[in-house]
């Protein structure tokens, strides 16, 4: 069953990463690829993403997940959210020599499948 997730990223957060020499869009893509390849609980049959520009407020990351069991969707979304927050925090820490970035507001919203 395909589910669509949306993650809104504020323009200010993107600028902070850019000032640190990082491209948050590329980081999110790489994190999603690694996460998909791990195949959490064997419940993700496929995953894809695209970015929608929202000028000047930032962008939205849409992730389409093909999940085997909808009852585990909440756990799968939480695992993906944790993977993104932890990975972005580590990348930012390494790029800035120990600086911290506020990522607690990053969370996915589950939408109806936008492909149907």
From Swiss-Prot:
Keywords from the named record: Early protein, Host nucleus, Host-virus interaction, Inhibition of host innate immune response by virus, Viral immunoevasion
Annotated compartments: Host nucleus
GO cellular component, one term: host cell nucleus
InterPro entries, per the entry: Mastadenovirus_E4/Orf3 (IPR009699), Mastadenovirus_E4/Orf3_sf (IPR038368)
Gene3D superfamilies: Mastadenovirus E4 ORF3
Pfam families: Adeno_E4_ORF3
Factors inducing expression: Synthesized early during infection.
Biological process annotations from GO: symbiont-mediated suppression of host innate immune response
KW Metal-binding (keyword) present: no
Record has Cytoplasm as a keyword: no
Function: Forms a multivalent network in host nucleus that inhibits nuclear bodies and prevents antiviral cellular activities. The network is made of multimerized dimers and surrounds adenovirus replication centers and nucleolus. Plays a role in splicing of the major late transcript. Prevents viral genome concatemer formation.
Family: Belongs to the adenoviridae E4 ORF3 family.
Assembly and oligomerization: Homodimer. Multimerizes through C-terminus tail by reciprocal or nonreciprocal interactions. Interacts with host PML isoform 2 C-terminal disordered region. Interacts with E1B-55k; this interaction is necessary for E1B 55 kDa protein to localize to the nuclear matrix fraction of the cell. May interact with host TRIM24, CREBBP, EP300, PRKDC and the MRN complex MRE11/RAD50/NBS1; these interactions may happen through nuclear bodies complexes.
Name of protein: Early 4 ORF3 protein
Source organism phylogeny: Viruses, Varidnaviria, Bamfordvirae, Preplasmiviricota, Tectiliviricetes
